[in-house]
Amino acid sequence: MAYDKQALIDQLSTLTIMELADLIDGLKEQWGVTAAVAVAGPGAGAAAPAAEEKTEFDVILVDAGASKINVIKELRAITGLGLKEAKDLSEKGGAIKEGVSKEDAEKFKAQLEGAGAKVEIR
């Protein structure tokens, strides 16, 4: 089907804004498309893409502090470890919970810091 591009442009130029909006809506419906903006890929020499927002965090015990008994109690409550395992973890440090949400990581950090421990979230 041949068409005259300039004739089509001239005909569309006579439409009002409301008529154009109706035309666009009709074409979207006919073609099954949305008005989403296409994101261009990075050009040559462009900076590296921004890092994705982190969704999983690790809670790391750095130091149990002076009140180890309270820290051990919190470790047992958070992890479900036995007394010996919680005591060993409090002495050597390391990962308490891995792959948890930011909210949970902040909650665990607050609990352990309240007991006197030094905790990091990575």
Curated annotation (Swiss-Prot):
Forms part of the ribosomal stalk which helps the ribosome interact with GTP-bound translation factors. Is thus essential for accurate translation. Transmembrane segments: none annotated. GO terms for molecular function: mRNA binding; structural constituent of ribosome. GO terms for cellular component: cytosolic large ribosomal subunit. InterPro entries: Ribosomal_bL12 (IPR000206), Ribosomal_bL12_C (IPR013823), Ribosomal_bL12_C/ClpS-like (IPR014719), Ribosomal_bL12_oligo (IPR008932), Ribosomal_bL12_oligo_N_sf (IPR036235). GO terms for biological process: translation. CDD domains: Ribosomal_L7_L12. The lineage of its organism: Bacteria, Thermotogati, Deinococcota, Deinococci, Deinococcales. Homodimer. Part of the ribosomal stalk of the 50S ribosomal subunit. Forms a multimeric L10(L12)X complex, where L10 forms an elongated spine to which 2 to 4 L12 dimers bind in a sequential fashion. Binds GTP-bound translation factors. Keywords: Ribonucleoprotein, Ribosomal protein. It comes from the Bacteria. Pfam families: Ribosomal_L12, Ribosomal_L12_N. This is Large ribosomal subunit protein bL12. Belongs to the bacterial ribosomal protein bL12 family.
